[in-house]
Amino acid sequence: MPTDNADLGQEDIDVFDNGRESFDRLNKPVLDGIGIEGNDDDDDDYLTLYNMTPRERLMYTFRRSMYKALDHFNSLPKWQRLLIILFGALVIVLGILMLIFHNKILDKVLETSKDLNERSSTNFILLVLLFFVGFPPMIGYSFLSTSTGLIYGVSFHGWFVLALGSVTGSVASFYVFKNLLHSRAEKLVHMNKRFEAFASILQEDNSYLMLALLRLCPFPYSLTNGAIAGIYGISVKNFTIANIITTPKLLIYLFIGARIKNMAEDHSTSSRIFDLVSILITLIIFTLTAWLLYFKTKQRYAQLKNQAVAQNSSANREVDFEI
């Protein structure tokens, strides 16, 4: 028999309120993702996933990511949405062409890589290109790095060329934006809310080890060079050291390039499948490692944020006590 709220006991009301609160908390991230209401992405409530099974967590995370991506896409200006659609169509067309003409394409890649390897000017050209893609908003760093692997394979020669061009370009970009384009560097910091969080960490700890950790996180290469220059207290020396100690990761690009070259040299299906699987596994491991470092650093940011809030609360209580 139905009852109204007047007939409910206090305990029943508490249970109802707690259930509604739990429902709101569970659905809050999804609502945030589709833009209904909620706080910033960095304020996600991880407790919503606590009682879910691994499969439920995977589906929940996938749906939430799709909602966020769709909401972000719809919030973009019309010309940017058009560019994304055109880029997606271009990728699909290139993928189809690769499936149809993959033998001819790989043969041409092999021929070009051998030709460039024999030219003495290739080293200088690669160094210049790698140097300039370090300046925002230039793009193409991953392409050039993989091309270095195509030409020289996994070798000290290839690593040295790639490392020298990357480090000098990054340091030069950092120096220019720090001393000549500082206002532009500060704008780059605020272009991404996640990068703002890292900027807060670097203001607390601007050591070369923390900078190296940031260099391993999944941020755009050239934009990171300019944005770090907008963070107060970071020296050219520490930035240079951070870039040098992260050069071993460049071997990943060389390995991928070498595997692509090997696919062009060996026409057997089994060998190509092995090379392709090797590339995919390498990319997955590299991506997972980068995101793991990102989330670990994000946790550090949350700790610093909580410490700052606690210190402010303590200071306010002391002021109130003195009054």
Curated annotation (Swiss-Prot):
Positions on the Cytoplasmic side per record topology: 103-123, 170-237, 294-323
Tagged with keyword Ribosomal protein: no
Signal peptide from the UniProt entry: none
GO cellular component: Golgi membrane
Transmembrane intervals: 82-102, 124-144, 149-169, 238-258, 273-293
GO biological-process terms attached to the record: mitotic spindle elongation; vesicle-mediated transport
Record keyword Nucleotidyltransferase present: no
Membrane topology: Multi-pass membrane protein
Comment field on protein domains: The VTT domain was previously called the SNARE-assoc domain. As there is no evidence that this domain associates with SNARE proteins, it was renamed as VMP1, TMEM41, and TVP38 (VTT) domain.
Cross-referenced InterPro entries: Golgi_membrane_TVP38/TMEM64, VTT_dom
Region VTT domain, residue ranges: 149-260
Gene name for this UniProt entry: TVP38
Role summary: Golgi membrane protein involved in vesicular trafficking and spindle migration.
Protein's name in the database: Golgi apparatus membrane protein TVP38
Lumenal membrane side: 1-81, 145-148, 259-272
Keywords: Golgi apparatus, Membrane, Transmembrane, Transmembrane helix
Family from the record: Belongs to the TVP38/TMEM64 family.
Top-level taxon in the UniProt lineage: Eukaryota
Entry's localization field: Golgi apparatus membrane
